[in-house]
């Protein structure tokens, strides 16, 4: 089966997306990370649909041009793409040097029933990429390991991919909080009660967005807060 190991860099040179599949004519092509995951899962259930890729019983929804705060041009959304979910440093893939493997200088449990990817990490190979965390660039083989890990976590641990609200519902969300601030300021005249009400409302907004974040749901936080503050300030200025 045909495949590829290309990375998609954003226009600022940072690697945030994983292109897992696309069609060349009628022929589906799958990424290295997706094919490795398929072999590890020992499944033949892999297919490309117009808006998603299905691996076994897990659906990988396609990243759209207007998905959340991560905006793309139409030319950047070809194929099936997902946002890369980099692990925290203490859960990053373990690395073994060539000499460690040759000399047996490692714990066999590190590789038992695990995916092992062999590649270069030397800077001289110029296979280095910038991640959203900044700092030193990351070798391509480590990026591939991140990609495989994310796919397997999604399938085996049912860890959800990032989900996004439709654009119209994001507008409604921002409008509701903007109007909420206006109503509070218009109806409440006592300064202390007004201040407490606005603080509680802001905390409620941030808490809802945080719960969404923990559930891998992108909810526009900053625009809603700005809308709340803007209408609050406008009504206060009007009343004074």
Q: Which functions belong to the PLM regions below?
A:
Residues 1-179:
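Flexible inter-domain connectors and hinge/loop segments
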Residues 150-240:
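Transmembrane alpha-helices and their extracellular/periplasmic helix-loop junctions
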